[in-house]
Amino acid sequence: MPIKTFKPYTQSRRHMSVSSFSNITKTSPEKSLTKIIKKKGGRNNTGQIMVRFRGGGHKRFYRIIDFKRDKFNIPAEVMSIEYDPNRSSSIALLQYLDGEKRYILYPLGVNVGDLLVSGPDAGIKPGNSLPISNIPVGTFVHNLELVEGKGGQFVRSAGVAAQILAKEGDYAHVRMPSGEIRLIRVKCYATIGQVGNLDHENITLGSAGRNRHMGRKPHVRGTAMNAVDHPHGGGRGRSKGNNQPRSPWNQPAKGFKTRPKKIWDWVIISRRNKS
């Protein structure tokens, strides 16, 4: 979707940009596919803060998304393309021939009225879901399963796509959006094409108010805290007082490896690109 900018009649509007929503065809969601989300403010069941700087924001209804695409060999018509406040990508409403409706992630290039199918015999066209064994090498895919039948877990953000590079036995070599090349079982399902809403990465919020509207609270610097609250806190003036940057829990930051060497690291052929 194209990006809309504004004249700088205030300082926050100067750099603000929003999506034009030009491809959105329906404004209200399908009521049977929504449920209420209760905001937690980053807290767990005992009230402790598990994720800092979360809270507030606009009320949202959760749209139930079909990540499994397990209604095989039944054509579904794309009824509408809708906005989803819970994710960066748009969503598409499908209606199957038997009358059932489901939401899926909106694949780039799919239009209202198109027919989509999932199953081993589906054609290679954007929006169709197939096992990796039936997808040609070089094809771009999204909504990629990691465990057979569990539903898509990888490649679901706006504008991303993974590429199938090779197939060898029970596994396929897949290049992820991060640049990592890893093995995924060929029985896992993936959806053809790229996730829509490509211009999401170009949107600039422009004001603190829009951040609060999304449920994000101000991120406090460690040097602005007291010594009891952060390793960088305290002291005379704004000085963190130590040489190496650290997290609030005193773990070295900026380059310190925190990922454990797990048993299944053998599935990673090539590590991701590091910026």
Swiss-Prot record:
Region (Disordered): 222-257
The UniProt record lists the keyword RNA-binding: yes
SMART domains (alphabetical): Ribosomal_L2, Ribosomal_L2_C
Pfam families on file: Ribosomal_L2 (PF00181), Ribosomal_L2_C (PF03947)
Ranges of biased composition (kind: Polar residues): 240-250
Database matches in InterPro entries: NA-bd_OB-fold, Rib_uL2_dom2, Ribosomal_uL2, Ribosomal_uL2_bac/org-type, Ribosomal_uL2_C, Ribosomal_uL2_CS, Ribosomal_uL2_dom3, Ribosomal_uL2_RNA-bd_dom
Domain of life: Bacteria
GO biological process: cytoplasmic translation
General function of this protein: One of the primary rRNA binding proteins. Required for association of the 30S and 50S subunits to form the 70S ribosome, for tRNA binding and peptide bond formation. It has been suggested to have peptidyltransferase activity; this is somewhat controversial. Makes several contacts with the 16S rRNA in the 70S ribosome.
The protein's name in its UniProt record: Large ribosomal subunit protein uL2
Protein's organism: Endomicrobium trichonymphae
